[in-house]
Design a protein with these regions (language model features):
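Hydrophobic alpha-helical transmembrane segments in multi-pass integral membrane proteins
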Residues: 158-166, 218-226, 304-311, 383-384, ...
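Transmembrane helix-loop boundary segments of multi-pass membrane transporters
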Residues: 39-40, 58, 105-117, 134-150, ...
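Alpha-helical transmembrane segments
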Residues: 128, 132-138, 163, 188-202, ...
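Flexible loop linkers connecting adjacent transmembrane helices
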Residues: 60-78, 103-109, 312-324, 349-365, ...
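Structural signature of hydrophobic alpha-helical transmembrane segments
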Residues: 41-53, 110-122, 170-183, 235-236, ...
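Signature of multi-pass transmembrane helix bundles
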Residues: 1-57, 72-73, 171, 184, ...
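Small-residue-rich segments of transmembrane alpha-helices in multi-pass membrane proteins
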Residues: 19-23, 51, 79-87, 147-158, ...
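Helix-loop-helix junctions within the multi-pass membrane cores of secondary transporters/permeases
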Residues: 80-151, 329-410
Length: 506
């Protein structure tokens, strides 16, 4: 167990370290910071690393077995209505505990946290149920995505522009480190039982469809809900002078975040207990392992949220405002690209997906191939986000052609690539995006006097758009390469046949 925890902490370190080093360099060059502020950031980074380590291990021990167990059990039932209701309930409950969603909700001033969280959670629940039905009835994923995104862009014509970027951001943050292991395991469980051939293709696409639900629900919220007049206010960093002041800031925030986490995790734990009582699916040892996993998840989430809200997010905001307020404001673009490149390389949820992709495709799509494609795509996405912050370009002019290209590419690649690509979009926009890149954009937008809701929000959405395009381009190249290899083999066989005939004549 200790070795696994060390491994998870190392993964978290590789995720947080690049950002930490970039901030340290900027703090002594373009954006000087007070020592106390830097101490808050570094302490927050440590809590983030340890918290994500505990959290990933806990999710692996609890969420993944729960998802796979529920998936296999449901798939054996013949009652479709029961399957739909259980998938909806579980999708909703699991999403409420997603830390990325809580981070986003704290930054949307005009919508109460509970309203936004429940709206998004219901969206995930509805589309998880639809995604399970897709597997059961073997409906094409590409057709489902085409219909879903067509509906989304019709709704954008009626929803207020203030909700557009927030809606697509919500779609990106909900599929994070707590929901991805559960949703993918649920898909594997259902497809393994219900499909006889090609179930590996079926197991992908759940994350992609679950990312659509929150976007749809928030756009509907914009049409029917009248938000408050609360305006975004810049995050203020508490004045800290001594190390005691630093410790005090984290100690003050700890109880509130502990309460949030416990309230979020308890329903999931209750579902696990109820599932065990009804099915007796787990043996005693598995049950103990799952219980320890929930404990690790709680510890990790508390450390994660405390580190993010007290030390990490405020410094991202400060850095953005400092860069935008300087004479070198355009440096935001290359710095954003650099951060985007390294963020996705070690995003926890991405690593979960990459490993499962490599296993399912038998190594055809390796982890290194996935990482390279995602890193380049996300770097370009963050560059566009920073251009939006500096110029005020509407996100609509990027999202529409971007998703149109992704859906067109889906016609020319194998179905497994479609599922992988759109799943990657949901998981690439993970903790580091919502906790650092979004505050960075918000700080820069505030310093420039822009509209935070329309210009800064949307970073997560563009990061989520990059993988569907990048990976499907990789899929097109893979198809052409496979055809070339097949043709070469055919030519060789043909040549061998001619030689054999000549030998026979001699």
């Amino acid at each position: 167990m200790n070795e696994k925890l060390k491994e998870k902490v190392k993964e978290s370190l590789s995720s947080v370290l690049p950002i930490t080093l970039i901030v340290l360099v900027l703090s002594v060059t373009l954006v000087p910071m007070e020592i106390g502020t830097l101490a808050l950031f570094l302490t927050g980074a440590v809590l983030l690393i340890v918290g994500m380590g505990f959290f990933q291990l806990g999710a692996e021990m609890s969420m993944t077995p729960l998802g796979e167990g529920v998936g296999k059990t449901l798939a054996k039932r013949e009652k479709v209505l029961l399957i739909v209701l259980v998938a909806f309930a579980l999708g909703t409950i699991i999403t409420i505990a997603e830390p990325d969603l809580q981070v986003l909700a704290n930054q949307v001033a005009s919508i109460p946290n509970s309203v936004l969280i429940w709206t998004v959670a219901v969206g995930v629940g509805v589309f998880l149920a639809l995604a399970v039905l897709r597997i059961l009835f073997r409906v094409s994923l590409a057709k489902c995505l085409l219909g879903a995104y067509a509906l989304l862009f019709v709704l954008t014509l009626f929803s207020p522009k203030e909700f557009l970027a927030v809606a697509f951001d919500a779609g990106g943050v909900t599929t994070g480190p707590i929901t991805v292991p559960f949703i993918m395991a649920l898909g594997v469980g259902v497809s393994a039982i219900r499909s006889t051939q090609g179930h590996d293709d079926d197991s992908f696409g759940l994350v992609a469809l679950c990312s659509v639900g929150p976007i749809l629900m928030v756009l509907l919220l914009g049409i029917f809900y009248h938000p408050t007049d609360a305006a975004y206010s810049a995050v203020e960093i508490a004045p800290v002078i001594t190390t005691r002041d630093v410790a005090q800031q984290f100690a003050l925030g700890f109880p509130g975040y502990a309460e949030e986490v416990l309230l979020s995790i308890l329903p999931i734990a209750a579902v696990c207990v109820l599932f065990q009582l009804l099915t007796r699916y787990y043996r005693r040892r598995q049950l103990l392992r799952t219980g320890v996993g929930f404990l690790y998840t709680v510890i990790g989430l508390i450390l994660f949220l405390t580190g993010v809200n007290v030390g990490f997010t405020p410094v991202g905001n400060l850095l953005g405002s400092g860069l935008a307020g300087s004479a070198y404001r355009w440096v935001l673009i290359p710095i954003g690209a650099l951060i985007g490149y390294y963020i996705v390389k070690a995003e926890p949820a991405v690593q979960v997906l990459n490993k499962q992709v490599e296993d399912v495709t038998g190594g055809t799509v390796s982890q290194s191939m996935m990482n390279t494609a995602l890193s380049i795509g996300v770097a370009c996405a963050v560059m566009l986000s920073m251009v939006r912050v500096l110029t005020g370009i509407s996100i609509y002019w990027i999202l529409v052609p971007g998703y149109a290209l992704a859906l067109i590419l889906a016609r020319y690649v194998p179905s497994v690539f479609v599922g992988i690509a759109f799943d990657s979009g949901g998981v690439a926009s993970g903790p580091m995006t919502s906790t650092f890149l979004l505050p960075l954009a918000m700080g820069a937008c505030t310093a420039l006097g822009g509209n935070v809701v329309t210009d800064a929000f949307g970073v997560v959405a563009l990061v989520a758009l990059a993988p569907p395009v990048a990976i499907q381009i990789m899929g097109v190249l893979y198809v052409h390469k496979s055809k070339a290899v097949a043709q070469n083999k055919a030519d060789l066989l043909s040549d061998d046949g001619v030689i054999d005939l000549e030998d026979e004549e001699i």
